Regions:
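Short, surface-exposed ligand- or partner-binding patches at beta-edge/loop junctions that are enriched
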Residues: 127
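Hydrophobic alpha-helical transmembrane segments of integral membrane proteins
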Residues: 8-9
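N-terminal signal peptide c-region/cleavage motif recognized by signal peptidases
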Residues: 12-14
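Rhodanese-like catalytic fold shared by cysteine-dependent sulfurtransferases
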Residues: 19-63, 68-71, 84-123, 133-174
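Short hydrophobic beta-strand that contains or immediately precedes a catalytic carboxylate
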Residues: 76-81
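Positively charged n-region of N-terminal signal peptides that target proteins for export
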Residues: 1-4
Length: 174
């Protein structure tokens, strides 16, 4: 009987301790700090919630991102915007892109992941326009075995290439 009572008390505790936590991939909104108990969609930014444990990538400001490019010439730059946004042919403002960046639209990343396999041992620096797609792409890279993934918070829309020598050196304005 004592064993039964002990089991009744311990089972709920072990079940509770295994409960997954879900979060919105960092998008620079207040919802970045909210933790949910089940999968779904963020009510604020409408991004798909991900397991909190999957967010094992580093987030850097634009200035820190540029410094990382300077200090790590072997890093791979991954622009996850559309081809039109990347090359400046889109109908809306496209801002520009980092020199030597690889462009794979986040919508195509899952099926094109194999193109990046040769870079698994290198640091991958991921960016987009407003830091909405790049956190999603960063999480996908981590889920696919990439261990050194860095996301640029804010996106290229926050860049003023005239204000920083590093950005003038590495960023192409459309």
């Amino acid at each position: 009987m004592k064993l039964f009572l002990l089991l009744v008390l311990l089972v709920p505790i072990s079940v509770l301790s295994q409960t997954k936590e879900y979060v919105c991939p960092p998008c620079n909104h207040s919802c970045d700090e909210v933790v949910y108990s089940k999968p779904g969609t963020c009510p604020d930014c409408h991004m798909t919630l991900v397991a909190k444990s999957s967010l094992r990538y580093e987030n850097l400001t634009v200035d820190e991102f540029c410094e990382r490019i300077s200090s790590n010439p072997n890093a791979v730059l991954l622009d996850v915007r559309s081809k039109g946004e990347f090359d400046g042919s889109a109908w809306r403002s496209t801002y520009g892109h980092f020199k030597n960046a690889i462009n794979i639209n986040v919508e195509e990343l899952e099926e094109r992941m194999g193109e990046l396999d040769k870079y698994k041992d290198r640091e991958i620096l991921v960016y987009c326009s407003h830091s909405i797609r790049s956190p999603r792409a960063s999480a996908m890279l981590i889920e696919n075995g990439f261990e050194r993934v860095v996301n640029m918070s804010g996106g290229v829309s926050t860049i003023d290439p005239k204000s920083d020598e590093c950005l003038r050196k590495y960023f192409v304005v459309h």
